[in-house]
Amino acid sequence: MLYPTPIAKLIDSFSKLPGIGTKTATRLAFYTIGMSDEDVNEFAKNLLAAKRELTYCSVCGNLTDDDPCLICTDKTRDQSVILVVEDSKDVSAMEKIQEYNGLYHVLHGLISPMNGISPDDINLKSLITRLMDGQVTEVIVATNATADGEATSMYISRVLKPAGIKVTRLARGLAVGSDIEYADEVTLLRAIENRTEL
């Protein structure tokens, strides 16, 4: 169906979001058009504010509005353990279970030889830098149970083991190919409790 240009552009913008197909993008576009000017302005203001005000923590790489983030500056957290995740959504998923009390490190991607993504293309160098002070004794790799997640975890283990750092992996309560952000709290809790050494 042919839509007026402003609606077609809005549909195109919504369809660029992950998991949003043309049908959902069309529904969102028409819903947005039906919103009051006040609500549309509020939505646009919040979207722009999030884009402008959020940054990545210079220590762990997590999305934050403070640098360093609240997790990195919280001295009550266990400073000897770092849980490594693919992205900030995974930090949120782990924090929901309210059982893990260590620090995080966000990679912003995974090693993917098939897609030409090497260790230099993700946030690994800063992880190694964080480990140099000797305070961290364990790194828990919490990447998704995919080929790229496995490649990343094996690389991290290979790099860190010679330094005497214990490297563990979440237990397999997570189905192969599943994303951490979609796992329920009990599954994540069991995965942390039953982690295995790499």
From Swiss-Prot:
One Pfam family it belongs to: RecR_ZnF
InterPro entries reported in the protein's UniProt record: DNA_Rcmb_RecR, Rcmb_RecR, Rcmb_RecR_Znf, TOPRIM_dom, TOPRIM_RecR
Domain Toprim: 80-175
Zinc finger annotations (C4-type) as residue ranges: 57-72
Keywords on record: DNA damage, DNA recombination, DNA repair, Metal-binding, Zinc, Zinc-finger
One term of GO molecular function: zinc ion binding
Record's keyword annotation contains Metal-binding: yes
Keyword Zinc attributed: yes
Task performed by this protein: May play a role in DNA repair. It seems to be involved in an RecBC-independent recombinational process of DNA repair. It may act with RecF and RecO.
Name of the protein this chain belongs to: Recombination protein RecR
Organism, as annotated: Streptococcus agalactiae serotype V (strain ATCC BAA-611 / 2603 V/R)
Lineage: Bacteria, Bacillati, Bacillota, Bacilli, Lactobacillales
Gene: recR
